[in-house]
Amino acid sequence: MLPSQSPAIFTVSRLNQTVRLLLEHEMGQVWISGEISNFTQPASGHWYFTLKDDTAQVRCAMFRNSNRRVTFRPQHGQQVLVRANITLYEPRGDYQIIVESMQPAGEGLLQLKYEQLKAKLQAEGLFDLQYKKSLPSPAHCVGVITSKTGAALHDILHVLKRRDPSLPVIIYPTAVQGDDAPGQIVRAIELANQRNECDVLIVGRGGGSLEDLWSFNDERVARAIFASRIPIVSAVGHETDVTIADFVADLRAPTPSAAAEVVSRNQQELLRQVQSTHQRLEMAMDYYLANRTRRFTQIHHRLQQQHPQLRLARQQTMLERLQKRMSFALESQLKRAGQQQQRLTRQLVQQNPQSRIHRAQTRIQQLEYRLAETLRAQLSATRERFGNAVTHLEAVSPLSTLARGYSVTSAADGAVLKQVKQVKVGETLTTRLGDGVVISEVSAVTKTRKSRKKTSNP
């Protein structure tokens, strides 16, 4: 006889479905470690096996789309770490797990720790771009934190010597593998910051397995990189190796050699820049001289077209002022060119390309000498043209004619007298001599002719 309030009654199908939904929704995705047994792979390509430990076991399935990403062939008795979803196979009521990924137990546990630390540091903001420091350009001193016997150090030094042989390098030797490595790497970073000898650091090592590179997945190393005041370039392993240090560093280089490329400057490129600057300086000086020559020609042309001495004096004053301005401008230009040459010389001395620097300095000295000679020649020619113009103007001036003993007589109305018929007896005349003026009154007018003379008395 059933009770008055009947409990819920499940069919077998509904029961299995309810249990499956509870397992999938409540448990979600989990990580499981265990030993493989009863491994089979039918023609479908799916994997079926059992995971067990000392006291229990569970059935597992890994479908073809997932197992083709596994890089090894599972073996009976092998310890593995799997990421899986818990479910229930409803037709038989079998509880099982659906595996999404599989790794050997050693690397798998490390990978799990890696993912957990990555998520933790990312949540704290250690990977944020706002905290990334810019690398110096150019670097004046590079620090290298790596093993002093490893291939990574050899690769870094080889690239730096090839690209920028005068760049100072300070090595902070440290272990990069083993239990003591994280602590040594942290101390090396702190030491580099205390000494403050370098303006960029390369932290890294050569390639290896996940266990070999694990020192650079250590939380202490990550936090030391983040706390460094000096920008850090991480260079761990090969391009496919990505560590926690890569995420925290200010820049990740795929290899140690690539890191050396990033922090160094190409000496050949610097020489090309110097040559380009020198060429632009020559062009600027040529343009400046042509412009000033054109200006002198215009001034000389205007002086030739203007006669009065007052205007001539003003033009002379203007010319002198322009000459002073030009001299000042040229001196300033030469001074700036000299300062630029000194800066370029210092840079070249730092890079130690002595022979090219010597040739560049010799060329600049030749240009300076040619420039000075050209300016002196043009100034001398301008002064000579100016003197000739003054002499010509003085030669045709009426005042010069008077100075030679001639005189000019004008009537009372100012008209210059050319014939005696313009003069009347008793009229007042003005005669201009070389050194003054004579005022006279006409008492008689005589006109000279070949046959006779005419005389009139007042």
Curated annotation (Swiss-Prot):
Its EC number is 3.1.11.6. Coiled coil: none annotated. It is found in: Cytoplasm. GO terms for cellular component: cytoplasm; exodeoxyribonuclease VII complex. GO terms for molecular function: exodeoxyribonuclease VII activity; nucleic acid binding. It catalyses: Exonucleolytic cleavage in either 5'- to 3'- or 3'- to 5'-direction to yield nucleoside 5'-phosphates. InterPro entries: Exonuc_VII_L, Exonuc_VII_lsu_C, OB-fold_nuc-bd_dom. It comes from the Bacteria. It is an enzyme of class 3 (hydrolase). Belongs to the XseA family. Heterooligomer composed of large and small subunits. PANTHER family: EXODEOXYRIBONUCLEASE 7 LARGE SUBUNIT. This is Exodeoxyribonuclease 7 large subunit. It comes from Escherichia coli O1:K1 / APEC.
